[in-house]
Amino acid sequence: MKTILSSETMDIPDGVAIKVNAKVIEVEGPRGKLTRDFKHLNLDFQLIKDQVTGKRQLKIDSWFGSRKTSASIRTALSHVDNLIAGVTQGFLYRMRFVYAHFPINASIDGNNKSIEIRNFLGEKKVRKVEMLDGVKIVRSEKVKDEIILEGNDIELVSRSCALINQKCHVKKKDIRKFLDGIYVSEKGKIAVEE
């Protein structure tokens, strides 16, 4: 069954500028600027002003859409919400080194843009992981064997974490027993709202 019109709106917070140009959304805030392309979705994006409250809103419409198209409205809203959170607060992921015997040594270099992992399972091989654009990596001062990744784009930060995690993949051993690696321990935002 096709629905004639499905639409949802979301409020745009103060201090955030949004531009919509042919399904390309550009969000600008205190932490910087992010853009996202929604050309693959059959949706209409509009910037409107609420009649009652006078707040700026982003309205997403889907005309004559199936259930999947209607579901993509909520997905697009979530992506825009992540863009707004990124330019206002930023995203922070914490990763912990897990090892049973051989301590993992990691050195951060290249102006906080890459990490070199040594002594993983006692191997001599040096694993180097470059961070994606806009992602900064630092060592935690408070907690031993912890690194912190931060950036504005949640997808780039989480993909950088995945790259680090995949470099420390245990091969030719039972992964239920050999749990060594670098794992994400905490996800959050840099600037916490009061």
Swiss-Prot record:
Q: Which gene encodes it?
A: RPL9D
Q: Could you state one GO biological process linked to this protein?
A: translation
Give a GO molecular function annotation for the protein: structural constituent of ribosome
Q: Which UniProt keywords apply?
A: Phosphoprotein, Ribonucleoprotein, Ribosomal protein
Q: What is this protein called?
A: Large ribosomal subunit protein uL6x
Xref: InterPro entries:
Ribosomal_uL6-like, Ribosomal_uL6-like_a/b-dom_sf, Ribosomal_uL6_a/b-dom, Ribosomal_uL6_CS2
Q: Which residues carry this modification: Phosphothreonine?
A: T75
Presence of keyword Ribosomal protein: yes
PROSITE patterns assigned to the protein according to its UniProt record, in alphabetical order: RIBOSOMAL_L6_2
Record keywords: Ribosomal protein included? yes
Query: Whose protein is this, by species?
Result: Arabidopsis thaliana (Mouse-ear cress)
The opening ranks of the lineage are: Eukaryota, Viridiplantae, Streptophyta, Embryophyta, Tracheophyta
| GO cellular component annotations of the record | cytosol; cytosolic large ribosomal subunit; cytosolic ribosome
- Tell me the protein family, please: Belongs to the universal ribosomal protein uL6 family.
Please give the Gene3D superfamilies that the UniProt record associates with this protein. Ribosomal protein L6, alpha-beta domain
